[in-house]
């Protein structure tokens, strides 16, 4: 049994610290990406090209789709033939830690498609569960095997200084680690991520099918500084959820004892929903969660990704698109803040942060 990463002197850096690169996966799952994923592939391409201006992008793509991916991306990425069940690199990729000598360690969590037999979104996730270890092997990085502890990368945020941010709705959901107490889950996080403190937000984004991942509702933009998804519409179920999160954060301090500066990031003014026109594009396998017309999608500008030279922010053709860009431009004065049309990623069930995973420098 290997010592825990914490005992070995490793910790999880913040996303805004320097990257060696970013991991992504080419979107091909017919039950996630409608109409052969054509629109999604264009969106992924724009994201990859933007990230690649400042760091290496590793793209997992199976041999059958390699020539297609190359037709979009040419030599802008490093292609790796690693099989997957879907394209959520944030959730299936490794969480890569560093120590003070600059050595890296990849944490491999158990993945069960956001809830396994209890409320998972698809039943065959065998390949996804191997992505983290296979990618670490390709990078020749040592692996810390955290299995059978179930976790996705989108369920944790780190400030790089000992603080981990999570939601209770996700980490305490019955489909993850039902046999562990909250205290046991917290201790596992602290040991596996080399952290000092876990902050438990009550909620994420309304109807987020990941059981409300933290990366859709709140994110660190600097030490003791956060953005929080927000709405002033008291009739929207999101209002009470964000309000509860805000009240908790206002009382909390980070691992160093500092109070937080909190920036409210509005959610889109118009609700993003699945339309009748979207539905014929999906092809499901048995046991896979199906979309329905009018289904509210968990749209949030908080699902941005911080790359070395840019911050990539979802856009929804909404009046709040520019508001979100303006707020984040103030948070990241040294980076280009880039809006990316993101509805076609949202139709898959996540957004820009969900399809990216940073590899620290």
UniProtKB/Swiss-Prot annotation:
SUPFAM superfamilies: Pentein
The EC number(s) this enzyme carries: 3.5.3.12
Residue numbers annotated as active site: 354 (amidino-cysteine intermediate)
Any one GO molecular function term: agmatine deiminase activity
Keywords of the record: Hydrolase
Signal peptide: none
A biological process from GO: putrescine biosynthetic process
Disulfide bond as UniProt keyword: no
Record's keyword annotation contains Hydrolase: yes
Pfam families per UniProt: PAD_porph
InterPro entries: Agmatine_deiminase (IPR017754), Peptidyl-Arg-deiminase_porph (IPR007466)
Reactions catalysed according to its record: agmatine + H2O = N-carbamoylputrescine + NH4(+)
Family: Belongs to the agmatine deiminase family.
Identification of the protein by name: Putative agmatine deiminase
Species the sequence originates in: Streptococcus pneumoniae serotype 4 (strain ATCC BAA-334 / TIGR4)
Lineage summary: Bacteria, Bacillati, Bacillota, Bacilli, Lactobacillales
Gene (UniProt): aguA
